[in-house]
Amino acid sequence: MAHKKGASSTRNGRDSNAQRLGVKRFGGQAVNAGEILVRQRGTHFHPGTGVGRGGDDTLFALAAGAVQFGTHRGRKVVNIVPLAV
């Protein structure tokens, strides 16, 4: 076994791809059912009315309406407010 690394060899040179997390639909924006609202690790935002949570903590719309961000009992929540017809 060589105890010196060969020429132009390195132990570095790796980097992971970005995860593209964050808010995808902002407050007041109209959405349809199934649209992704927030991609996150952990529950930075909690699901509110009309919002579901996936296995990777992604929040998505369960119904069509407008996105609304707010707080409930000290937690940040995302709600879907039905649009007036």
From Swiss-Prot:
Residues 7-19 have a biased composition (Polar residues). Keywords: Ribonucleoprotein, Ribosomal protein. GO terms for cellular component: cytosolic large ribosomal subunit. One of its GO terms (molecular function) is structural constituent of ribosome. SUPFAM superfamilies: Ribosomal L27 protein-like. One of its GO terms (biological process) is translation. Residues 1-22 are annotated as: Disordered. Belongs to the bacterial ribosomal protein bL27 family. HAMAP family: Ribosomal_bL27 (MF_00539). This is Large ribosomal subunit protein bL27. It comes from Streptomyces griseus subsp. griseus (strain JCM 4626 / CBS 651.72 / NBRC 13350 / KCC S-0626 / ISP 5235). The gene is rpmA.
